[in-house]
Amino acid sequence: YIPIYLIKNNIAKKVIASDINKEPLNKAKINAALDGVSDKIDLRLGGGLYPLKNKEAQAVIIAGMGGNLIRDILENDLDKVRNLDYLILQPAQNPEVLREYLYKNDYEILDEDLCIDENKYYELFKVRYKKGDYISLESIFYEISPFMLNKKLPLLKSYIESKIDKNKKVIEFITDDTEHAIQR
């Protein structure tokens, strides 16, 4: 859906969409045809940035996977990453792992945002590779972004509250003295 949106809203003239599995690409092909944009979307099978040639794109969107996998994709194709104007990253889990990697590995954070979909929060990053931009933060700031704190995002308070609730549940689980917990 993202490639179709980019074309239909004149954000991009041409889009390369890739996936490691054939089925999502087949669905994308059908959706692109239904929306009349098949000629502007190049569908490619492959994982990570592998299907992309070096210097072929200005920007890349990596979304719908965990922060660990996004980090690995960036690390595995650093030559391609260095030649991009920017990347949009949306980890489905572990955004703190990705944030720490970005800060410690020469990425400039251009923007960060939050969204919520079906009661699940998602963090979004707009970044670019910039040699010499190594920054180390206190560990709490990998969990809660200083960028988002400074922007005072509307969803930030409820996002932090949800993280606190989740951590309280983990603490309750590991300190539970029920018979079942004792057996664990």
Q: What are the language-model segments listed below?
A:
Residues 13-14, 40, 86:
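Residues at the starts of beta-strands that form the adenosine-phosphate
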Residues 16-18, 44, 88, 125:
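Hydrophobic/aromatic beta-strand patches that form the interior of the parallel beta-sheet core
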Residues 18-58:
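S-adenosyl-L-methionine
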Residues 1-12:
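Conserved SAM-binding loop of SAM-dependent methyltransferases across substrates and taxa
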Residues 62-63:
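A short beta-strand submotif of the Rossmann-like class I SAM-dependent methyltransferase core
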Residues 10-11, 33-38, 79-82:
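Short helix-capping segments at alpha-helix termini
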Residues 50-51, 56-59, 68-184:
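Class I S-adenosyl-L-methionine
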